[in-house]
Amino acid sequence: MKIWTSEHVFDHPWETVTTAAMQKYPNPMNPSVVGVDVLDRHIDPSGKLHSHRLLSTEWGLPSIVKSLIGAARTKTYVQEHSVVDPVEKTMELKSTNISFTNMVSVDERLIYKPHPQDPEKTVLTQEAIITVKGVSLSSYLEGLMASTISSNASKGREAMEWVIHKLNAEIEELTASARGTIRTPMAAAAFAEK
């Protein structure tokens, strides 16, 4: 078993970061995620948003793994459960693979919280537990997978910034459009008075 952990601070408020986290896929930074399906989404009586999603991924595999499973590329599926608590301002996301579970398990946990000293920033704490089963090189493979997870986490943070930039651009566009819509009737009314 290999445990990988990371902490990152986003220079954006919690509301922005959690909105982006829910819209992270697809993105150009991590094209291995080829599909996201929402299986269930509901708000519980306390106001927490619960989501259960299925992520479809396609990976190019290292040669040692190819020889073990007999494939060069493989589609895998990951189940993801998240809980967003708008009162406590926390988002906890847990994911686990549901493909190849007889060979490997990857359990990941992400927690987004406002930065304790700066509410305009958000802290992401990330942990992955990797277990390769039934292979004599399991420790080596777990290390290799931890390295891949670390690289993908970096891509994931880039993707979050990309989504946040995209969301901000959409907000600016909608704001500009709304201003134009408001001005047009006002200009017409002013013209009609003349």
Curated annotation (Swiss-Prot):
InterPro entries: PRELI/MSF1_dom, Slowmo/Ups. Signal peptide: none annotated. One of its GO terms (molecular function) is phosphatidic acid transfer activity. GO terms for biological process: phospholipid transport. It holds the Pfam family PRELI. Residues 1-172 form the PRELI/MSF1 domain. Disulfide bonds: none annotated. It comes from the Eukaryota. The modification Phosphoserine is found at residues 46, 51. This is PRELI domain containing protein 3B. It comes from Homo sapiens.
